[in-house]
C-alpha cells in the first residue's frame, strides 16, 4: 500500500457558489483551487486521506511538497495504473464532491476494468448563508432608503447617488457573504464533514476501458441494507433494487465495507429517503451514464438466475464442460434461431441442425430437451396481450424482444420473476418483484407497490409490460390486483376481464385466495373514504342509515338550543309536524304516572287459619304492571338546520342526517302510548289509606243485653263520627318529631292466609250465629301531599304520602308480609264495664268514613291533656293486672288448649306488625275456665321486653289507633260510673274491657282460682286499655263495697 497524491483541478475545497463558473480574482480562492488529494492506494483499492490528518504547511512548503509529489507520482505511474484511474475519475466528479473510496471489482471480461466509487457531498441545506445575505441586503436597503427619503427634497441628484451606493453596498455584502460561505465550505470539506451535519453519499459504477464512463448511480438512503454474498462479494439493496459487487481481493472488500457502513450510518441519522429533498445533485450523474450495453448489463446483474440475457457478441466463449451450462446455452441459441426462421416452413430437425452448427457440437443426447424447449418458446412467442391501454401482459419472450417493446411504446417493465434477468436495464426502467410461482409465496404485500409503479408510468405517458415466465400466474395476478384497485372492480369482474383478454391465465390457488383477501381490503378502504369524505349536497339528501348511533345524542348545549328554538316557534304560532302529538302524549303519560303514584302498596300480617276470617281484595299493584317512564335521552332529538333545498337536517358534531317530515313512530312508542291510554280509562278503584279502622264487636249470651245493644251501637257510632270521634282523632297528629316515646316490643304469632288480615277471636258456639260479617267500604280519593324532607313517620305533615326507604321510621322495614293488613284505629266498643260475665269476644272490620283530619297545632294541645292521664294510670294498671293473673292461676289449675297445641309446645316465630299484636286462635281460646263455667275470660300474655327510648312508632296508622283507643277507654270509663256489669252499653267490647273484666272477676272472687296467660299488649293502645280497665275495676269494687256496707 502506498501514499498516492492526485492533483485535482478544480479542488474539493471549491466554494458552493453557482455552477455557472463565476471567476474569482481573489488570491485566496486561487490558492484554494490549487490543491491536491491524498489516497492510500493498494492492489485494487484507493482510500482518501482526509486533509485534517495532514499537518498545515506554508504556501512555499505546500508548493514544494506538491512538486515533489508530482515528480514521485510520475515515476510510480509506470508501475501502477491506480493513479491514472483516479485522475480520470476526478474528471467525472463535480467540483463539490469528494471521492471517499474506490475499489476494483471483478468482471466477466478479462480486458475490462470496473471500479466501485463512493462519492460524497457536503450540502448547505440549512440556508444560513442565504438568509443572512437576504437579511443584510434588506437591512442596508431599508437603512439607506430611509436616509434617502429624508433628503430627497434637497437635491434631485441625491437619489441617483444613493441608489448607486445601495447597489454597491449590496454587491459588497454579497461578495463578503460569498467569501464567508466559501471559507465555511472549505473548512467543512477539509474536515471531511459538514458543519450542519448533512453529508450525502452515493455509489458510482465507473468503467475504465478506452475511456472512463459512468455505468451505475445508486444513492445511499436510510433504507440501504448491506449483505455478504458468501462468494467474496456483497450486495447492496436500496429502494427494492439489489446490486451485486465482488471486489478483487479480501482487503479491497474489507475497505469497501468499512466506508460503506460509515456513509450508510450517516444516511440513517439524517433520514434520507427516496424522492426526498436529498440527493438532488445525482441527476447530473444520471444524465451522464454513457457505458456500453454490455457494461450496463453487468452493473445490473442479479443473483439466482435461471434465464440470463444473451452474451455480448464480442464475448469469448468456450465449450461448456457441464450439462447444465450446455442446456443454458441451448436455450439462448434456440431462441435466436426460432426468431430468425419461418416456423411454418421449417421442422424441428432443421432447427436442431442449425443449433449444432452454431455450437459446433453433437446434440443427439439433447433431442428431447430441444423439443420441449421449442414448445415452451412457441408458447412464449405470442404477442403480449393488451389488457388496458397502458398495460401489457406477456412472457419472458416478450420481455426479451426489443423491437416489439419499442413498437408498443413500452418504457417500463415489471418483472415478476426471480429466475429471469432484466434484458435491457439501460434502455427500460425496471421494477422487480422477485418471487417464485409456488403456494408459499406472499404476493399480496407487493400489490400496492406495483399499483404505484403502473400509475406513475401512466402519468408519464408510458406503457408497462408485466411479465413472468409464461405470463400465466404471477404476472396475471398482479394485473388483476391492479384492475381491482384502479377501477374499483370486484374480484370476479377483474378476473373475467383479464381472462377475456388473455384466455391462458391461470393463477395458482394461493394467489386466488390472496386476491379475494385484497378485494376485502379494498372494500374496507372504500368505506373508510366514504366516511371521511366531505359532506356534499348528495350526502345531505341521503336518507339511508339516518339513525342516531349510540352515544351520538345531542350535547346539552344543542339540547338547550333546540328547546329555545321550539319555544320561539311556539310563541310565533308555528308548530312543527309531530310536536303537538308529542305534547299530548307527554300529558297523558304524566296523568298516568300521577294515578300510579296514588296506588299504595303495603305489606301486611295475616290472621291464622281459623274458621272465621276476613276476606278482602288486594288493591296493590306490582312494579311489573307499572309502565316504566322513558328517559329523556331515549327520545329522538334533532337540531334542525334548514338547507337550501327546502329540507331539514340534523346537525351534530360528527354527522349530518336528513330529517323526514313524517317519521313513523316506533313500536316501543306505540305500545307506551297504548298503555298510557288504557291507564286513563281505568275507573277509580278504592285505595287503602291510613284512616281505615279496626272495629271489634262482641255479643253477650243474655237476651236483654243483646236486645238493648242494637240501638246503642248505631248511636255511639254516629256520635263518635260527629263530635267525640273528631275531637279525639284530631289529637292523634299532635306528635312532636323530637319527642321520645316508649313502645313495647310486639310479637305476633301469625300464619299467612292469602290477602286477608285482621284479628279474629274464636267465639263460643252460642255466639257464632250472632257474629256479623266484615263490611269493606272504600274511602274517597283525596289529593296527596309530598313528604317533607325532614319529616318522620308519625308527624302530621306526611300522613298522606308514600313511604320512603330512607325515612326515619320503621314503616318500610316492618311491612314485609305479603298480605294486606287493615290499619286504622279501633272504634269505641264498650263505653262502660257494667257486665260481670263476658262469654265471647269477636273482632270484625269496618272502615269509618267522614273523619276530620285536624291540624297539628290543635292535636298537640289535645294530646298534652291526655298525656297526664296515661302516666297516672300506668303503674296502677300493671299492679292490678299482676293481681288478676295470680288470682286466675289460683282459680284455674288446668288449661284447655286446642288440639294443635295440646300435643307439644310450639315455638312460633314472632312476626313484627306495625299496627297491633295478632295471636293464634289456639292461644286466645276460652281456656281459663272450666267447661261449665259461665264466665269467658281472655287474658293476654305479658312480656317484659321493651324497645329503646328512641324507637318511634312507624306510620300514622299506629298513632291513630293508640290515641283513639286511649280516648275511647277514657270515655268508656267515665260512662260506666261504678258497676261491674255493662248495662245499657251494648254488646261490643274491646280487648281492654276483656282484661278489665278479668281483673274485676278476679277481685270479686278472690277465693276462686284462675289461670291465665300473660302476654304483652299488642301496642300502647292495649297498654292504655289496661290502665282504663284497672281504673274501672277499682271503681266498681269501691261501689260494691259501699253498697254492701
UniProtKB/Swiss-Prot annotation:
Residues 1-35, 58-80, 143-194, 306-325, 529-631, 699-799, 1001-1045 are annotated as: Disordered. InterPro entries: DEK_C (IPR014876), Dual-sp_phosphatase_cat-dom (IPR000340), Phosphatase_SSH-like (IPR043587), Prot-tyrosine_phosphatase-like (IPR029021), SSH-N (IPR043588), Tyr_Pase_AS (IPR016130), Tyr_Pase_dom (IPR000387), TYR_PHOSPHATASE_DUAL_dom (IPR020422). Residues 586-601 have a biased composition (Basic residues). Residues 66-80, 704-713, 721-732, 1029-1045 have a biased composition (Low complexity). It is found in: Cytoplasm, Cytoskeleton. Residues 1-20, 149-174, 560-569, 602-625, 764-774, 1008-1021 have a biased composition (Polar residues). Gene3D superfamilies: Homeodomain-like (1.10.10.60), Protein tyrosine phosphatase superfamily (3.90.190.10). Belongs to the protein-tyrosine phosphatase family. Tyrosine phosphatase activity has not been demonstrated for this protein to date. This is Protein phosphatase Slingshot. The gene is ssh.
Amino acid at each position: 500500500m502506498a501514499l498516492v497524491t492526485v492533483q485535482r483541478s478544480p479542488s474539493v475545497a471549491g466554494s458552493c457558489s453557482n455552477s455557472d463558473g463565476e471567476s474569482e480574482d481573489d488570491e485566496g480562492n486561487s490558492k484554494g483551487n490549487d490543491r491536491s488529494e491524498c489516497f492510500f492506494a493498494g492492489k485494487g483499492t484507493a482510500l482518501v486521506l482526509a486533509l485534517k490528518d495532514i499537518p498545515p504547511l506554508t504556501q512555499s512548503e505546500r508548493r514544494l511538497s506538491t512538486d515533489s509529489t508530482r515528480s514521485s507520482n510520475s515515476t510510480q505511474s509506470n508501475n501502477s495504473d491506480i493513479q491514472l484511474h483516479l485522475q480520470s475519475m476526478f474528471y467525472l466528479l463535480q467540483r463539490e464532491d469528494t471521492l471517499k473510496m474506490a475499489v476494483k471489482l471483478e468482471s466477466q471480461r478479462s480486458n475490462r476494468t470496473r471500479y466501485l466509487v463512493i462519492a460524497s457531498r457536503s450540502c448547505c441545506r440549512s440556508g444560513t448563508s442565504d438568509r443572512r445575505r437576504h437579511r443584510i441586503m434588506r437591512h442596508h436597503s431599508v437603512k439607506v432608503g430611509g436616509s434617502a427619503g429624508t433628503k430627497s427634497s434637497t437635491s434631485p441628484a441625491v437619489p441617483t447617488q444613493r441608489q448607486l451606493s445601495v447597489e454597491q453596498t449590496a454587491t459588497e455584502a454579497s461578495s463578503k457573504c460569498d467569501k464567508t460561505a466559501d471559507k465555511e465550505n472549505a473548512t467543512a470539506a477539509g474536515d471531511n464533514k459538514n458543519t450542519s451535519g448533512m453529508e450525502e453519499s452515493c455509489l458510482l459504477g465507473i468503467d475504465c476501458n478506452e475511456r472512463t464512463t459512468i455505468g451505475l448511480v445508486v444513492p445511499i438512503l436510510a433504507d440501504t441494507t448491506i449483505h455478504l454474498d458468501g462468494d467474496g462479494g456483497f450486495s447492496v439493496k436500496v429502494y427494492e433494487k439489489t446490486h451485486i459487487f465482488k471486489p478483487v481481493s479480501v482487503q479491497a472488500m474489507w475497505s469497501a465495507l468499512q466506508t460503506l457502513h460509515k456513509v450508510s450510518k450517516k444516511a440513517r441519522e439524517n433520514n434520507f429517503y427516496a424522492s426526498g429533498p436529498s440527493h438532488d445533485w445525482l441527476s447530473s450523474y444520471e444524465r451522464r451514464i454513457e457505458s456500453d450495453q454490455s457494461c450496463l448489463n453487468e452493473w445490473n446483474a442479479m443473483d439466482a438466475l435461471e434465464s440470463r440475457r444473451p452474451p455480448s457478441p464480442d464475448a469469448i466463449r468456450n465449450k461448456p464442460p457441464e450439462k447444465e451450462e450446455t442446456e443454458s446455452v441451448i436455450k439462448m441459441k434456440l431462441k435466436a434461431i426460432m426468431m430468425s426462421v419461418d416456423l411454418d416452413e421449417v421442422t424441428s430437425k432443421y432447427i436442431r441442425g442449425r443449433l449444432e452448427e452454431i455450437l459446433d457440437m453433437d446434440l443427439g443426447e439433447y433431442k428431447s430437451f430441444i423439443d420441449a424447449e421449442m414448445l415452451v418458446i412457441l408458447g412464449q412467442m405470442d404477442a403480449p396481450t393488451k389488457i388496458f391501454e397502458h398495460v401489457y401482459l406477456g412472457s419472458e419472450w416478450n420481455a426479451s424482444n426489443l423491437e416489439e417493446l419499442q413498437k408498443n411504446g413500452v418504457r417500463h417493465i415489471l418483472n415478476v420473476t426471480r429466475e429471469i434477468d432484466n434484458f435491457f436495464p439501460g434502455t427500460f426502467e425496471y421494477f422487480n418483484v422477485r418471487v417464485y410461482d409456488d403456494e408459499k409465496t406472499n404476493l399480496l404485500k407487493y400489490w400496492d407497490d406495483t399499483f404505484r409503479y403502473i400509475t406513475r408510468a401512466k402519468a408519464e405517458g408510458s406503457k408497462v409490460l408485466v411479465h413472468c415466465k409464461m405470463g400465466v400466474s404471477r404476472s396475471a395476478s398482479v394485473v388483476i390486483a391492479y384492475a381491482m384497485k384502479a377501477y374499483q372492480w370486484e374480484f370476479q369482474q377483474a378476473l373475467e376481464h383479464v381472462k377475456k383478454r388473455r384466455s391462458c391465465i391461470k393463477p395458482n390457488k394461493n394467489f386466488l385466495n390472496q386476491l379475494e383477501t385484497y378485494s376485502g381490503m379494498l372494500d374496507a378502504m372504500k368505506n373508510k373514504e366514504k366516511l371521511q369524505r366531505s359532506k356534499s349536497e348528495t350526502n345531505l339528501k341521503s336518507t339511508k342509515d339516518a339513525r342516531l348511533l349510540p352515544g351520538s345524542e345531542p350535547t346539552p348545549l344543542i339540547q338547550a338550543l333546540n328547546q329555545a328554538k321550539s319555544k320561539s316557534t311556539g310563541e310565533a304560532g308555528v308548530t312543527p309536524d309531530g310536536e303537538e302529538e308529542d305534547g299530548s302524549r307527554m300529558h297523558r303519560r304524566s296523568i298516568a304516572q300521577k294515578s300510579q303514584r296514588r296506588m299504595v302498596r303495603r305489606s301486611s300480617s295475616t290472621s291464622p287459619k281459623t274458621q272465621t276470617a276476613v276476606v278482602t281484595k288486594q288493591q296493590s299493584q306490582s312494579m311489573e304492571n307499572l309502565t316504566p317512564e322513558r328517559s329523556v335521552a331515549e327520545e329522538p332529538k334533532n337540531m334542525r338546520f334548514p338547507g337550501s333545498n327546502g329540507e331539514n337536517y340534523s346537525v351534530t358534531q360528527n354527522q349530518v342526517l336528513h330529517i323526514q317530515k313524517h317519521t313513523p313512530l316506533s313500536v316501543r312508542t306505540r305500545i307506551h302510548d297504548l298503555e298510557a291510554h288504557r291507564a286513563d280509562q281505568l275507573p277509580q278503584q278504592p285505595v287503602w289509606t291510613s284512616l281505615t279502622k279496626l272495629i271489634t264487636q262482641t255479643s253477650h249470651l243474655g237476651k236483654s243485653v243483646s236486645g238493648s245493644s242494637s240501638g246503642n251501637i248505631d248511636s255511639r257510632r254516629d256520635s263518635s263520627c260527629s263530635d267525640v270521634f273528631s275531637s279525639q282523632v284530631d289529637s292523634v297528629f299532635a306528635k312532636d318529631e323530637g319527642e321520645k316515646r316508649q313502645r313495647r316490643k310486639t310479637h305476633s304469632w301469625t300464619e299467612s292466609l292469602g290477602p286477608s288480615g285482621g284479628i279474629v277471636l274464636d267465639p263460643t258456639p252460642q255466639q257464632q250465629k250472632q257474629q256479623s260479617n266484615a263490611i269493606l267500604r272504600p274511602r274517597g280519593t283525596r289529593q296527596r301531599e309530598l313528604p317533607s324532607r325532614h319529616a318522620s313517620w308519625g308527624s302530621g305533615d306526611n300522613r298522606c304520602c308514600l313511604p320512603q326507604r330512607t325515612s326515619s321510621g320503621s314503616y318500610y322495614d316492618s311491612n314485609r308480609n305479603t298480605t294486606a293488613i287493615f290499619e286504622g284505629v279501633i272504634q269505641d266498643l264498650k263505653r262502660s264495664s257494667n257486665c260481670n260475665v263476658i262469654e265471647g269476644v269477636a273482632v270484625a272490620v269496618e272502615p269509618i268514613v267522614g273523619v276530620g283530619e285536624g291540624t297539628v297545632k290543635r292535636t298537640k294541645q289535645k294530646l298534652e291533656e291526655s298525656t297526664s292521664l296515661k302516666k297516672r294510670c300506668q303503674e296502677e294498671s300493671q299492679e292490678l293486672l299482676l293481681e288478676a293473673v295470680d288470682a286466675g292461676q289460683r282459680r284455674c289449675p288446668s288449661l284447655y288448649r286446642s288440639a294443635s297445641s295440646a300435643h307439644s309446645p310450639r315455638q312460633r316465630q314472632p312476626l313484627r306488625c306495625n299496627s297491633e299484636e295478632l295471636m293464634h286462635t289456639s292461644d286466645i281460646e276460652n281456656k281459663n275456665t272450666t267447661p261449665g263455667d259461665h264466665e269467658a275470660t281472655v287474658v293476654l300474655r305479658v312480656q317484659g321486653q321493651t324497645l329503646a327510648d328512641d324507637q318511634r312508632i312507624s306510620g300514622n296508622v299506629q298513632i291513630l289507633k293508640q290515641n283513639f283507643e286511649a280516648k275511647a277507654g277514657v270515655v268508656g270509663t267515665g260512662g260506666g260510673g261504678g258497676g261491674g256489669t255493662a248495662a245499657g252499653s251494648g254488646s261490643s267490647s274491646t280487648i281492654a274491657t276483656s282484661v278489665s273484666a278479668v281483673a274485676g272477676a278476679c277481685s270479686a272472687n278472690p277465693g276462686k282460682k284462675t289461670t291465665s296467660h300473660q302476654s304483652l299488649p299488642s301496642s300502647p293502645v292495649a297498654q292504655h286499655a289496661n290502665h282504663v280497665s284497672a281504673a274501672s275495676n277499682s271503681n266498681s269494687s269501691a261501689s260494691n263495697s259501699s253498697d254492701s256496707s
